């Protein structure tokens, strides 16, 4: 099975320009290719991971990746299938975000070894050197307005309005391809399926300006089995930056993937062989309640993104919280595991009587209910059941001198911080 066949078998090929020519190029020698990442935030997220890992698979097959950080295009904003204009960021912010994204990409691509080691480029380096007049004369003249307006990504915005700034975005992305081909002999661009219009602007410019053929391959935009856009948890993006989405939160995200999606995601997001995945699928289908596919997915992706130690910590947090063993976890681990539960910062004037604190922290709705909860054995401090109505919270209840975990019943948690 050649690399293109494997990508197809994994569900990673959505659309290509001349497929036969692309397969020929990939099987006859080393291809230099690029994927672009606009710094629209200070971190990449799971939605980017499909293209990143596809790039890694091609590198493992001997091809040479260029990771392009859009320091210039990030200042403009991509209109593709967006309902409204993006807010423009300052140059300083975009450059700062660009540096962070460069660091994240080095986790996945090999920038050190071999003749196909990855290269990092930033399109700000060339766009900052081109005057507006030169850009119009040397690039803009190759694009007709009719051609630009025919793109689906633009058509959808004509009704609501699109600025010239965003309208010109596709020409900038097209020029990226031309520049990388001219300087580094890059002949293939990889990106999300929503980028098709911008990406083919690059092949058009190559054909007209340099009489060369470029290839484009898009990866699918991933949705779950209900059609919901993939990569968000509770409406929030799942970030690759551990400070924005902890390894535990990412682990839980994968653990909660639906049965109908789990095996498909193993093919897309892990480097397990297709034969290994077929074995997992067989075991998984025989006992779905054991969630083997989800557990494997969580292990593989968290290890890939954050490392083995982070995976082990996420697994330990999961197991200890499930067993109610709060005291076996550090304050930092508890902050990861209980990041979504109510948090109350204890004030110096607060009563430390347990019944009072249950009401103050919003765990019980009233003192009467709080007393009943304590007497009925429904209240736990750091995993220990407390039935003393006169119990006073003390330093002994502080984990690492930072927090106390209170649980009411089986599932209602609150964290007291000091």
UniProtKB/Swiss-Prot annotation:
GO terms for biological process: tyrosyl-tRNA aminoacylation. It catalyses: tRNA(Tyr) + L-tyrosine + ATP = L-tyrosyl-tRNA(Tyr) + AMP + diphosphate + H(+). Belongs to the class-I aminoacyl-tRNA synthetase family. TyrS type 1 subfamily. It is found in: Cytoplasm. Catalyzes the attachment of tyrosine to tRNA(Tyr) in a two-step reaction: tyrosine is first activated by ATP to form Tyr-AMP and then transferred to the acceptor end of tRNA(Tyr). One of its GO terms (cellular component) is cytosol. L-tyrosine binds at residues 34, 169, 173. Homodimer. This is Tyrosine--tRNA ligase.
């Amino acid at each position: 099975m050649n690399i293109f066949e494997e990508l197809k078998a994994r569900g990673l090929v959505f659309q290509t320009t001349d497929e036969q020519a692309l397969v020929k190029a990939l099987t006859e020698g080393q291809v230099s290719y690029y994927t672009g990442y606009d710094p629209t935030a200070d971190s990449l997220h799971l939605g980017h991971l499909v293209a990143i890992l596809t790039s890694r698979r091609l590198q493992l097959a001997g091809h040479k990746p260029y990771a392009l950080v859009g320091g210039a295009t990030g200042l403009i904003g991509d209109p593709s299938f967006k309902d409204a204009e993006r807010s423009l960021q300052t140059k300083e912010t975009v450059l700062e975000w660009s540096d962070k994204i460069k660091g994240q990409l080095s986790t996945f691509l090999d920038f050190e070894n071999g003749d196909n080691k990855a290269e990092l480029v930033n399109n700000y380096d060339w766009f900052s050197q081109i005057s507006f007049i030169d850009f119009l004369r040397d690039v803009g003249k190759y694009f007709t307005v009719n051609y630009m307006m025919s793109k689906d990504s633009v058509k959808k915005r004509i009704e609501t309005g699109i600025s010239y700034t965003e309208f010109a975005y596709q020409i900038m992305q097209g020029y990226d391809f031309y520049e990388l081909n001219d300087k580094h002999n890059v002949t293939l661009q990889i990106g999300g399926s929503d980028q098709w219009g911008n990406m083919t602007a690059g092949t058009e410019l190559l054909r007209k300006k340099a009489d060369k053929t470029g290839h484009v391959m898009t990866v699918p935009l991933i949705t779950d089995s209900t059609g919901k856009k993939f990569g968000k948890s509770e409406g929030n993006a799942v970030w690759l930056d551990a400070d924005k989405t902890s390894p535990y939160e990412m682990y839980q995200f994968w653990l909660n993937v639906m049965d109908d999606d789990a095996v498909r995601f193993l093919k897309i997001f892990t480097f397990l062989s297709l034969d290994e995945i077929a074995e997992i699928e067989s075991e998984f289908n025989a006992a779905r309640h054991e969630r083997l596919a989800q557990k494997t997915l969580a292990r593989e992706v968290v290890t890939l993104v954050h490392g083995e130690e982070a995976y082990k910590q996420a697994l330990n947090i999961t197991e200890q919280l499930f067993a109610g063993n709060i005291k076996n976890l550090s304050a930092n681990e508890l902050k990861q595991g209980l990041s979504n539960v109510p948090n109350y910062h204890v004030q110096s004037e607060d009563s430390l009587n347990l019944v009072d604190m249950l009401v103050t922290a919003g765990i019980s709705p009233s003192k009467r209910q709080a007393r009943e909860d304590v007497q009925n054995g429904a209240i736990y401090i750091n995993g220990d059941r407390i039935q003393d109505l006169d119990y006073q919270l003390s330093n002994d209840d502080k984990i690492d001198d930072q927090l106390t975990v209170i649980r009411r019943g089986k599932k209602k948690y609150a964290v007291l911080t000091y």
